[in-house]
Amino acid sequence: MKNNRNEQIAKFMDTKLKHLNPMLAVDFYKTIHHLAYVPNLEYLVSYWTPRMTRIANVDKVVMFGMQALIKNHLMVYFYINFFNRPWEDVEAEYKRVIAHTMTEQASDTTELKKLHSLGYLPIQISAVPEGTRVNVKTPMFEIRNTVKGFGWLVNYLETYISVNIWQPMTAATIAYRYREIVNEYYEKTVVGGVPSSACGDFSMRGMPAEEAAFRASAAHLLSFTGTATIPAIIWLEDYYNCDCTKEVVGKGVPSTEHSVMSSYGREGEFECYRHLIEDVFPNGPLSIVSDTYDYWNVLTNYLPRLKGSIAKRNGKIVIRGDSGDPVDIICGSLQAKDYIVIDGLTEDGIKNYFKHEAENTYPWNGTSESWYKVRIGNYLYDVTCYHEWTTDEDGDGYYSDIVEEVEIEKREITIEERGTIELLMEVFGYTINEKGYKVLPAYIGAIYGDSITLDRIGEIYKRCADKKLAVSNVTLGIGSFTYQYVTRDSLGFCLKATHSIVDGVERQIYKDPKTDKCKGNNFKKSQKGLCYIYRDGDDVLYKEGLTFEDMKKPEYANNLLRPVFRNGELLIDEDLATIRNRLHNGNF
């Protein structure tokens, strides 16, 4: 049995894909373009551009992933699987595949042999610095060949580059949008909080592949520090000069899952909480998933019984919901817009208030009755005011704003209407910060990591703020729906040729489809000529239609596109901290 197992492992270790020639890691049509380009093409220049946005409230794209692409793919992978392999092996592999799946003509290796003999990729990539937010329609990087006659190579690499970079750029852009929302509400409701810890990444299990998970979580970590994806930290260490032993690259929190909670059985659920809090994790942070059976019972029964143990721990207990509508679970289904709160008002004073004060405070539509919902503590009062009938000097009757009688119906607000944060405050108390928002003690909090979309984080934060609850009372987890439910077309990425030298003559080239008139966007139209990328306030814009001579002029000396890769060598090697600070203007 052991020998058979080892034989199988040995067989499966030696796969074709593991050592795939990168010149085969392309779309089929790329293989014939060296034959199809205009004769005597010497140089080609192409630009990578986000042509559009399908993500709400996003009009700028975060540059991220280039350094990893260069190190892992354009340098290491090309060296191992192309330049460092015998040409005979490379050619045989290429011809075997292309001749039998495309055409014999497509399997021509004349240009590939020249490239292999050269020993490096004769291209230059110039890019905006990573962490820069670039306006939609502005080029983010440029690719050109550095050796005459290799113009065909520029766009041959498009597929290989695109598949490795559109996703980290998209994820970094989405994560930044979450951070914008976090910053807005932290500024409004939180004193002394840490916005970078507000959202964790929970996406790995739902991503389409390991590498996709690593990239997406690494992109998330440009704007936040929390992640459940351990390899993302290693990925950033490998490619972005950071060290998790010396700085916060990413961090996790000890957390339970439902198999842990259900292993105690329903009858042993309270013992599960007690054992975890008092015996297993008496110190440090601990997140406990709490909806295995009855989430509300945990909040209103178990936690009050464990209040003393939780309060004396050196660390934070975080209660995690994992089902239902996250907005209602966290904030309560009763919204602040559904009632009014009157400072200092008691139950005994409701009638007197609405007889003498309401007309000065709340709108009335001139009818015989007006209705209000008043919240005092955990009770809701339905107030009906009956207005006086009177007449004017002409004898015409009408209802006045004078209230003759007030009726009140009282009911207790349910635990579902109060929601997680309010229930935790009822057990553990709260303080009111300098901005007037309620804050749980440092040893208790809430977390929710299911279905937290961009729309939902905004709604959760708004409803918290409306109830005068600081948004730092809850941590939110961003999952694979957010980071996987995207495509290259979410931001319209493409690489298009715009400039060339043919037989010694410069030519500006472009794409402008007459049929590209969907909703008047014309988004498939490319730039023309060389591009100068510049900053205008908060915007990163471009000027097109330039020549090589133009680019030498002083007015174009500060092009934001800076060379990062040339002839097989990395030219700029930045660290994670630099990129984070650039993205967040020093306020990561």
Segments predicted by a language model, with ranges:
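Low-complexity, highly charged intrinsically disordered N-terminal segments
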Residues: 44-107
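Structural preference for beta-strand elements that scaffold enzyme active sites
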Residues: 285-287, 316-320, 443-447, 473-477
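Catalytic cores of alpha/beta
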Residues: 452-466
